[in-house]
Amino acid sequence: MNYECLARKVLESYSFIDPVFEFLRHNENITYKVTDRGNNCSFLLRIHTSVTEGFYGIQHTLDGLESETVLLQELGLNGVLRVQMPVANRFGKYVTGCRLENMDADIYATLLEWIDGDTFTHNEENLDEIVYAIGVTLARFHLFTRASAALKKLNRPVYGVEKIDNTLEKLRHGVEVDIYSMEHYGIMIEVLTQVKGIMRELDSHDGAWGLIHTDIQRGNIIITDNCEPCFIDFCLCGYGHYLFDIGSASTIMESKQRDIFLKGYTSQAPFSKDSLRYVEGLILMSIFLCYAFFIRDSVRNGWIKDHVERKVEMWKEWLTGKEIYYLL
């Protein structure tokens, strides 16, 4: 598929004068930086077709995408976070359907405002300040989604017990194609069974569940010139336990920075280190979700075999009750 041809077709629904395309990446979406030479403004164009079948989900549907734009607007218009605000097309819609002549169905696309800055590298000179600010930003996001009535019933993925069962079914394929052994798969089952127990415990805690980002990684945090961390790429956002985001964010920090991150978080929202066992389990869940995204893609799943072999002993230790938060 000629992606730039598709991108140009999408932009016919917007009021660009002289667009210049810069391909960024193709993971859960095809993304381009689009700069309009007519006014020198830049935007992020997302064409919602995934690089591998494992990424596809409700987040790629019209309802799912419209729900994501609601989240971005709620965050931006209420001044909660600086986010990439959605841009309406010439018909007043935030999601644009597009189909080339050789395509059987529409592909959806969205256009977002561009945020200038650099992706978080963990090598910044003022690292402690930025890590603390990431904790603050995440807490503010969680406080808002916990309280916002507008965000309670969006059409988004759900990261609960059923998601774990679905993930385990997908991971069985890894044994079938000899990516890892049945013994390794059995340990994954044990780990995720414990995680399901953790989820049931958390469900009895007030305010433990709500709309979360789910994909906080270094490439999804932009550090602006004034050192403000901005979360981007809410494509996988959905309903889950808030500790899931704390876990994801923790793993992008080196161990010695994690307490600084947690200090930033607790400056705005409640969190106790007594919850670290829960956080560890949800980190392991996020790892297995990532395996499931790629497990059937023979071109892109080669890293999983090595990763399992390097991490399986740690999983065993976690099953015995050992703390691994600062090792993950």
Regions found by a protein language model. Give the residues of each.
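Juxta-kinase regulatory segment immediately upstream of eukaryotic protein kinase catalytic domains
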Residues: M1-F21
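Active-site acidic catalytic loop and adjacent metal/ATP-binding pocket
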Residues: N27-N40, L44-L45, P86, K196-F244
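ATP-binding pocket architecture of kinase catalytic cores
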Residues: D36-A150
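A cross-family kinase active-site recognition segment
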Residues: N123-E183, W209
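All-alpha amphipathic helical-bundle segments outside canonical DNA-binding/catalytic cores
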Residues: E129, A133, N155, K273-I283
